[in-house]
From Swiss-Prot:
The active site is at residues 184, 366, 419. This is Serine carboxypeptidase-like 2. It is an enzyme of class 3 (hydrolase). Residues 1-29 form the signal peptide. It holds the Pfam family Peptidase_S10. It comes from Arabidopsis thaliana (Mouse-ear cress). PANTHER family: SERINE CARBOXYPEPTIDASE-LIKE 1-RELATED, SERINE PROTEASE FAMILY S10 SERINE CARBOXYPEPTIDASE. Probable carboxypeptidase. Expressed in seedlings and roots. One of its GO terms (biological process) is proteolysis. The gene is SCPL2. Glycans are attached at residues 109, 350, 382.
Length: 441
C-alpha cells in the first residue's frame, strides 16, 4: 500500500517537474517560423517569434516578431516598431502598415483567413522587431499578478531592458544601425525610449546599442497642442463653417479641451462642432464611418485578423505559450496604464542635442492627431530650416510635402494619408526607404 502511495507521489512530482520545465522553456524563448497558417507555401522571408523576460524575476514576458532584412541583414538597419494604443498589438504594424504580409480581404466563411505578400514592406531594406508592449498587449503577458501599472516612462525602461536582452541573444545585430519607430500613442513612448537608450549607452551598458535615430507617424506628442489643433484642422478641411470657427476662436481663445465650466458660450460652440464632426471617421476623414465590421468596410481586416490570431494552429505556429493569454484582441482599450508623459517635446529636444536623426510624418487627412499640431510643436522647438517646404515626389506625382531642420529632423506629410500608414503604405514605404538610406525625400 505504501509503495503504491509513494509511486503515485513520485508520478505527481515528475509531472510537476515536467510542467515546470515546459513553462521555463517559454521564458526567453525564440522560434524560427518557416510556415504560417493562411499563407501558401514557405514564408519568403526569415521570421522569428519569441518572448523576452523583463524584471528581476522575468515575470513580464514581452512577445515579439522579428523579420530579417531581405537585402543585407548583416549591415542593414535594425528597426524596433511600437504600435500605439496603449495596448494595440504590433500585429497592426506587421499586417497593416509596413510588414511583408497582410490579410487577404475575402468574405469570412468560417475557415482560416488568408495572408498574402505585400510590395511595401520596410523589411526590404531593414530588419524589424515588432514588439507587443505594454504587458497585456497582443501575446505579451505576466507570469505573476502585476502590482505596478505600466506607464509611459516605465515602458521606456522596459523596452530598453528588452533590447539589451534581445541583442544579447542576437549579437550578430549589435553593431547594426538601430532606430526606434512607431505611430499614434507611441509618440509619447518612442522619444522617451530613445533618451533611455542614449543614457544607458553612456552610463551602464556594454556593448552600447548603435542608436542612430527614430521615426514617428502622426505622433501624439503634447496633449494640449494636439487636441487643440483639431478645430483649426476641421475648419481648414471645410468640416465647420467660417462663422462657427470664428465664434470658437473668440469664446474659447484657442483652448478647446480644458474649458472652464463657466464658459458656457465656448461649450455651446464646441457642442456645435461635435455635431458637425461626430459622423466623421477621425483616423481618415475621407473614408466612410463604419460602425460594424462588414466586408465593404475598412475595419473588416481587423475582424479577419482577430479570427486568424485566435486560431489554434496559428498560435502553435507562432509558438505562443498556451497558458499566457485567453482571447487575443488587436487593441486592449482598457489596459491598466498610467499616462505619465503629458508632452514628449523635452525628449525630442534632448534627443536632438544628442545628435539623433528623426523622421516625423503626418497623414494629412487625420483628425485624431492633425498635422497642424505636429507642425506647431516642431515650430516651437525653434530649429533653423535647412531645406524649406517643398513637395516630395513619386513617379513625377506629388506624394506629400517636406521640410528639414538643422537638428537632423525631417518633417513630411503624406498626401491623402490618415492616422496610420495602413491608409497609404506604398507611399510611406518609399518615404521611409529614402530617409533610412540617407537620401532626400
Amino acid at each position: 500500500m505504501a509503495n503504491k502511495y509513494f509511486s503515485s507521489v513520485l508520478k505527481s512530482l515528475l509531472l510537476l517537474l515536467h510542467l515546470v520545465f515546459l513553462s521555463k522553456q517559454h521564458v526567453d524563448s525564440a522560434s524560427i517560423v518557416k510556415f504560417l497558417p493562411g499563407f501558401e507555401g514557405p514564408l519568403p522571408f526569415e521570421l522569428e517569434t519569441g518572448y523576452i523576460g523583463i524584471g528581476e524575476e522575468e515575470e513580464v514576458q514581452l512577445f515579439y516578431y522579428f523579420i530579417k532584412s531581405e537585402r543585407n541583414p548583416k549591415e542593414d538597419p535594425l528597426i524596433l516598431w511600437l504600435t500605439g494604443g496603449p495596448g494595440c498589438s504590433s500585429i497592426s504594424g506587421l499586417l497593416f502598415e509596413n510588414g511583408p504580409l497582410t490579410m487577404k480581404l475575402d468574405v469570412y466563411n468560417g475557415t482560416l483567413p488568408s495572408l498574402v505578400s505585400t510590395t511595401y514592406s520596410w523589411t526590404k531594406t531593414s530588419s524589424m522587431i515588432f514588439l507587443d508592449q505594454p504587458v497585456g498587449t497582443g501575446f505579451s503577458y505576466s507570469r505573476t499578478q502585476q502590482f505596478n501599472k505600466p506607464s509611459d516612462s516605465g515602458e521606456a525602461k522596459r523596452i530598453h531592458e528588452f533590447l539589451q536582452k534581445w541583442l544579447g541573444k542576437h549579437q550578430e545585430f549589435s553593431s547594426n544601425p538601430f532606430y526606434v519607430a512607431g505611430d499614434s500613442y507611441s509618440g509619447l513612448v518612442v522619444p522617451a525610449t530613445v533618451q533611455e537608450i542614449s543614457k544607458g549607452n553612456y552610463e551602464c551598458c556594454n556593448p552600447p546599442i548603435n542608436l542612430q535615430g527614430y521615426v514617428l507617424g502622426n505622433p501624439l506628442t503634447d496633449y494640449a497642442i494636439d487636441s487643440n489643433s483639431r478645430i483649426p484642422f476641421a475648419h481648414g478641411m471645410a468640416l465647420i463653417s467660417d462663422e462657427l470657427y470664428e465664434s470658437l476662436k473668440k469664446t474659447c481663445k484657442g483652448e478647446y479641451t480644458n474649458v472652464h465650466p463657466r464658459n458656457t458660450q465656448c461649450l455651446k460652440f464646441i457642442e456645435e462642432f461635435n455635431k458637425c464632426t461626430n459622423r466623421i471617421l477621425q483616423q481618415l476623414i475621407l473614408d466612410p464611418l463604419c460602425e460594424t465590421e462588414t466586408p465593404d468596410c475598412y475595419i473588416y481586416r481587423y475582424l479577419l485578423t482577430t479570427y486568424w490570431a485566435n486560431d489554434a494552429t496559428v498560435r502553435e505556429a507562432l509558438q505562443i505559450n498556451k497558458e499566457s493569454i485567453g482571447e487575443w484582441v488587436r487593441c486592449y482599450r482598457t489596459i491598466p496604464y498610467d499616462n505619465d508623459i503629458k508632452s514628449s517635446m523635452p525628449y525630442h529636444v534632448n534627443n536632438s542635442i544628442s545628435g539623433y536623426r528623426s523622421l516625423i510624418y503626418s497623414g494629412d487627412h487625420d483628425l485624431e492627431v492633425p498635422y497642424l499640431g505636429t507642425q506647431a510643436w516642431i515650430r516651437s522647438l525653434n530649429y533653423s530650416i535647412i531645406d524649406d517646404w517643398r513637395p516630395w515626389m513619386i513617379k513625377n506625382q506629388i506624394a506629400g510635402y517636406t521640410r528639414t531642420y538643422a537638428n537632423k529632423m525631417t518633417f513630411a506629410t503624406i498626401k491623402g494619408g490618415g492616422h496610420t500608414i495602413e491608409f497609404k503604405p506604398e507611399e510611406a514605404s518609399i518615404m521611409f526607404q529614402r530617409w533610412i538610406n540617407g537620401q532626400p525625400l
